[in-house]
Amino acid sequence: MTEKQQTFAEAMTALEEIVRQLEQGDVPLENAIDLYKQGMELSKFCHSKLQHAEEQLVSIVQETGETTAFDPLKGEN
């Protein structure tokens, strides 16, 4: 990552570009390894951002003022 704080969208764009390059299959081995390492770091960063967002949503205050646990696998009631 650069000195500037990267956003989730920027990291996802960079990760998608790395995946595209690796899927083409014409990247020299040394470059492919470097790209893979960068991709893993970006993946870790994105996962962390998503986890943080989920934690923020875990306690959603309903109109009644009650807090409920956020279940990402459950649809709306």
From Swiss-Prot:
Its EC number is 3.1.11.6. GO terms for cellular component: cytosol; exodeoxyribonuclease VII complex. Gene3D superfamilies: Exonuclease VII, small subunit (1.10.287.1040). Keywords: Cytoplasm, Exonuclease, Hydrolase, Nuclease. GO terms for biological process: DNA catabolic process. Its main location: cytoplasm. The keyword Hydrolase applies. SUPFAM superfamilies: XseB-like. One of its GO terms (molecular function) is exodeoxyribonuclease VII activity. It is an enzyme of class 3 (hydrolase). It catalyses: Exonucleolytic cleavage in either 5'- to 3'- or 3'- to 5'-direction to yield nucleoside 5'-phosphates. It holds the Pfam family Exonuc_VII_S. InterPro entries: Exonuc_VII_S (IPR003761), Exonuc_VII_ssu_sf (IPR037004). It is found in: Cytoplasm. Bidirectionally degrades single-stranded DNA into large acid-insoluble oligonucleotides, which are then degraded further into small acid-soluble oligonucleotides. Heterooligomer composed of large and small subunits. Belongs to the XseB family. This is Exodeoxyribonuclease 7 small subunit. The lineage of its organism: Bacteria, Bacillati, Bacillota, Bacilli, Bacillales.
